[in-house]
Amino acid sequence: MDNFNNPTPQNALSPEEERIRQEKINALNKRLLREEKERKNGWKGIFWTVIAALAIRSLIFEPYNIPSSSMVPTLLVGDYLFVTKFDYGYSRYSFPLSLPIIPRGRIFYNEPKRGDVAVFKKPPENKTDYVKRIIGMPGDTIQMRGGRLYINDQIVPREFKGQELWNTELGEQLYTRYTETLPNGLVHDIYELTDENKYDDTPKIEIPPDSFFMMGDNRDNSLDSREFGPVPAKNLEGKSRLIFYSTDGNGWFFQFWRWKEFLRLERFFTDIK
């Protein structure tokens, strides 16, 4: 009986070739594992970056921009602000989309001061961000008589500063500028068109507990507590602290050769008072 040996396949690899092939496979597997790990780490990095950004915006400070002239001359259309979120504590309106992380009231609450320029959700729908000055505190009575502000039946003194032409969303208007002194001594400027506008004569309004009366410094071009009433403390989002950027809207930031034309450089990094 004849003996036959199993023939070696013609395409069989030599031991050296097999070793090289295995090294290539191992190297490929290692590269794929490394790329998968880097991809996962990349997504983790993005996730934690987003979380950190949301935490900063919710708990520390948040940028806002001014779309209307209701706070002229203090804030101008095109101003960009840093608003600190910790001054008054936190409520659901401190968080993006007003998520009910804090379902009721505020935590770590510190009462605002009269004269603060605050950002809040406009009642009663509590959806739109407004920025106004805090004029009335809890327990105060507020009234406008003939264009003059009365707090607790005492007229708030104001000093004439002059007249100025100002371009607003309503066109060019001649404003009278006054310096107003609030009962706590805070001094700020206001604009008036006339003392005979819609909100220049109002009934007395008593401010409930944990609520505040908000008014724009542009007294005849501001939708504020004279229209929608006192603002609950829970609606407060933060205190306006600093203007970090300001533009008149007639150019783009990358047009550096035109910066002097449309950037209000003198307003950069100025405190809000």
Task: Provide a role label for each language-model segment.
Residues 44-61:
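Hydrophobic membrane-insertion alpha-helices, especially the h-region
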Residues 57-71:
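Aromatic-capped interface at the extracytoplasmic side
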